[in-house]
Amino acid sequence: MTNSWLPLEANPELLTEYSRTLGLPADVRFHDVLSVDAWALEMVPNPIQAFLLLFPLSADDTACCKGGSAKCTDIVFMRQFVENACGTIALLHAMLNLHERRMVTFVQDSYVARMYDSIQGLDPEKRGVWLSKDAEIANAHASIESEGQSVVSNGEVDTHFIAFIPSRDGPVVIELDGRKNGPVYHAPGTESDPFGLAVLDVIKREFISKNPNDIRFSILALSYHYSTILHPISPQVYPNDLPFPITEKFSLLCNRCLGSRSCKILTGKIPKH
């Protein structure tokens, strides 16, 4: 790898701040996923757009990093050529692919909006080289890692960030790891699993099973936070313009409350602005 940055920590507040600095809109944020059991997803605003995973590297990861499909015409993918840049690359993988699928709209003239235009037509290798030479993203990474609460190590780091996004077609989970040649496609545990459950199943099968006694796993979910804002126990109020119709707004709250009769949306008692 050409040079080295200091590692990021798996802190949802810091990564949300970082993503907004780069150009993600303020209505999208990261949330901790506290378990790989299904109940943990009930604590996170839905629908979940993408996941980040920080995991400990195992002895066979050197061989595994050569995997991945080089064919990724419908996915924004880049290689990692800067040591410890995995957190930034995982974040960019999530952001760029959500924008590619029109699931989010970047802040106009933001870093990531300009980057998205600059890397069009480049293959994953050239995108990685482009990123490794870009001083603006290096400075942004350095700025956010200095705000972390963890003790920063200058030695060898044995944890790694990757991203997961949903497939455009079917219930396949797509893993994006900058060490690999391209995306990795994971079949879900069952065909009926929604994206969130399918990702947790992949994390259990493909990652935790290799280091079952290691506690250095962190899972972060990226989603709009309207379902939390709209929830009756929230002290916040929702914004005037939501990026989905009122029927979807009801659906989010029904899922959040699991049909509770006390839900203010279900009873029509929507808090005023």
Q: Where do the PLM segments sit?
A:
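Cysteine-dependent deubiquitinase/ubiquitin-like isopeptidase catalytic cores across multiple families
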Residues: 1-238, 243-273
